[in-house]
Design a protein with these regions (language model features):
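Acidic/His- and Gly-rich active-site-bordering loop/insert found
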Residues: 2-119, 143-147
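An extended, acidic, His-containing surface patch that forms the Zn2+-binding/catalytic region
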Residues: 263-341, 347, 351-360, 367, ...
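Midchain, well-structured core segments that form catalytic/ion-binding scaffolds
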Residues: 160, 167-353
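Short beta-strand
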Residues: 67-71, 252-256, 334, 411-412
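Generic non-transmembrane alpha-helical segments
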Residues: 13, 17-20, 24-31, 56, ...
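Active-site metal-coordination/substrate-binding segment of hydrolases
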Residues: 86-155, 161, 442-454
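Acidic, glycine-rich active-site loops and adjacent beta-strand->loop/helix elements
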Residues: 93-95, 151-162, 182-187, 222, ...
Length: 468
């Protein structure tokens, strides 16, 4: 009864205050809160702009009479309610760079409303949902909703990069009874695959200059969140012209007199979805594997890629393929390849479901690297998360989602990383509904306002039901 009553009042409140919510979101979007360690200070470990975003949220909390705590610039929490037990909503204030602003239909850091959509960097990932959660605290306070469990909004500053924020937070604060991260999809993401970001590299002791074909240089952007979508190589030697023109059907080939420059471009895609697009690494290997007279150092790179990564998105060639009935199969993505006269390096991420341990993954990759004569470097590991569909949290979420949408709340798993995996008892839950397009991490990131209000209504129902 209480849930139904306050859900109705919440919708009315949101409809009356939507312009105010959008104004607060607009001010937060205007802060380009991208990690920048060149502006790092004692209370701004992730740089000036992320500190500015935190300061804006502190002012918001003080304005609304909400309890706020600053955790040395790593994270904030803003809360409302009483009781020893807590329910947490986990968000982040950092964003990925806007990229080429010419590809945006609106300025990325000036939120723009067109019909029922708003555009801007972070409107979906994750500033829009963050402001929505703060408005839930605000409406609970103004509607005097009786809460016997405190609701705490935890806000990190390094979700898009290193995750030091939540690591720092939970080193100094207890886990909540329940928690969820509105930084995913509906219905319920009850599983997130483990993620290992790593690289394989080799230093050259000598470089051959008399081979028929030499790869002088390979360049690609070191963005671990994407597939290898743009690759530049320089070819020299007596057969360089012949080899370069084999790429001409799908790449730009430029005669630079002393060498040939080949630019391979393929569609951008998130590294967790390597199966969705062609990638530049595969196109590079599919030509170079057949080249005779390739210099030994270049040949070792081509052989490494061909033997263990090329044309394989699920880890078969690594000897690590695994498929779980609930969480799906492993994925492997090479995100960048770079080589010069000193050596080469390839960055990759490997994602895996339950049933495959990180110890097994590390052991296999180390053995592979030793056999290939290359160095294996682990950059970051994010443990997998999984919560049983039978848990009280998921049961409450399922009921709220079905009540609001009239559809079943199915559980599913993703390769994505949300703060849900920092929780002992939590999942990712919205805000994006099935079939919605948000262009997260891309130009023209967008948020549907009707969907946002619907998501808030679902969250209100869940938070009230978990008070019992």
């Amino acid at each position: 009864m209480m849930e139904s009553k306050f859900s109705t009042e919440a919708i009315e409140y949101l409809e009356q205050h939507i312009d105010e919510l959008l104004n607060d979101l607009s001010e937060l979007v205007a802060i380009p809160s991208v990690r920048d360690l060149t502006t790092q200070t004692e209370n701004a470990p992730f740089g000036y702009q992320i500190r500015q975003a935190f300061d804006y949220l502190i002012k918001f909390a003080e304005r609304e009479g909400l309890e706020v705590r600053d955790h040395q610039g790593y994270a904030l929490d803003i809360s409302f309610g009483q009781g020893d037990q807590e329910i947490a909503l986990l968000h982040h204030v950092d964003v990925v760079p806007a990229g080429d602003e010419m590809l945006w239909r609106t300025p990325p850091y000036r939120m723009t409303k067109i019909d029922n959509m708003v555009f801007g960097r972070g409107v979906t990932d994750n500033k829009g949902p963050l402001i929505a959660s703060l408005y839930i605290l605000k409406l609970f306070k103004q509607l005097t909703v009786p809460l016997n469990k405190k609701i705490r909004v935890i806000i990190g500053g390094a979700e898009e990069t290193t995750w030091e924020c939540v690591e720092h937070y939970f080193q100094h604060n207890p886990q909540p009874e329940y928690g969820f991260s509105p930084d995913g999809d509906f219905p319920i993401v009850n599983g997130e695959k483990g993620i290992l970001y790593a690289s394989l590299g080799k230093q050259f002791s000598a470089r051959s200059s008399d081979s028929a074909c030499q790869i002088r240089r390979i360049e690609s952007e070191r963005d671990r969140t994407s597939t290898c979508h743009f690759l530049v190589l320089e070819l020299a030697g007596s057969s360089a012209e012949k080899v370069a023109h084999q790429f001409a059907a799908f790449a730009d080939v430029i005669d630079c007199q002393s060498h040939y420059r080949v630019e391979i471009s393929t569609p951008w895609e998130k590294s967790r979805n390597p199966h969705k697009v062609d990638n530049s690494m595969d196109k590079f290997v599919n030509i170079m594997r057949h080249v005779e007279g390739l210099d030994p150092n270049s040949a070792s790179l081509v052989h490494l890629l061909d033997s263990h990564f090329a044309n394989d998105y699920v880890g078969h060639k690594l000897g690590l393929y695994h498929n779980d009935d609930e969480m799906g199969y492993t994925t492997c993505c090479v995100s960048a390849i770079n080589m010069d006269s000193h050596g080469y390096n390839l960055d990759f991420d490997f994602r895996f479901p339950k049933g495959l341990s990180i110890e097994r993954v590390r052991s296999q990759l180390l053995a592979l690297s030793q056999q290939a004569g290359v160095n294996f470097v682990e950059h970051q590991y994010l443990p997998l998360s999984y919560l049983s569909p039978e848990s009280a949290l998921i049961q409450a979420m399922g009921k709220a989602y079905s009540d609001v949408t009239g559809t079943d709340a199915n559980c599913f798993s993703k390769g994505a990383a949300s703060y849900a995996r920092a929780l002992e008892h939590g999942v990712a839950f919205g805000p994006t509904f099935p079939e919605e397009v948000t262009f997260v991490h891309e130009p023209n990131e967008q948020l549907n306002l009707e969907s946002l209000i619907k998501a808030i209504t679902i969250y209100v129902k869940v938070l009230i039901s978990l008070q019992e």
